[in-house]
Amino acid sequence: MAVPKRKTSPSKRGMRRSADGLKAPTYVEDKNSGELRRPHHIDLKTGMYRGRQVLTPKESA
């Protein structure tokens, strides 16, 4: 069974754990509609992605 040769220092332990924290999701303002959307995602209000119409938006009821 593998056993560590040296004790992990608090600094190394902290560096390893630094990637474990949750980050708030990022949003960008859409150029056409002004709505907030996730980057690299389709704008669900307009159905546009990178300047192209990729899906037809649902009609608001």
Curated annotation (Swiss-Prot):
<dbReference type="GO" id="GO:0015934">
    <property type="term" value="C:large ribosomal subunit"/>
</dbReference>
<feature type="compositionally biased region" description="Basic residues">
    <location>
        <begin position="1"/>
        <end position="16"/>
    </location>
</feature>
<keyword id="KW-0687">Ribonucleoprotein</keyword>
<dbReference type="InterPro" id="IPR002677">
    <property type="entry name" value="Ribosomal_bL32"/>
</dbReference>
<dbReference type="InterPro" id="IPR011332">
    <property type="entry name" value="Ribosomal_zn-bd"/>
</dbReference>
<keyword id="KW-0689">Ribosomal protein</keyword>
<dbReference type="GO" id="GO:0006412">
    <property type="term" value="P:translation"/>
</dbReference>
<comment type="similarity">
    <text>Belongs to the bacterial ribosomal protein bL32 family.</text>
</comment>
<dbReference type="InterPro" id="IPR044957">
    <property type="entry name" value="Ribosomal_bL32_bact"/>
</dbReference>
<feature type="region of interest" description="Disordered">
    <location>
        <begin position="1"/>
        <end position="33"/>
    </location>
</feature>
<dbReference type="GO" id="GO:0003735">
    <property type="term" value="F:structural constituent of ribosome"/>
</dbReference>
<dbReference type="Pfam" id="PF01783">
    <property type="entry name" value="Ribosomal_L32p"/>
</dbReference>
<protein>
    <recommendedName>
        <fullName>Large ribosomal subunit protein bL32</fullName>
    </recommendedName>
</protein>
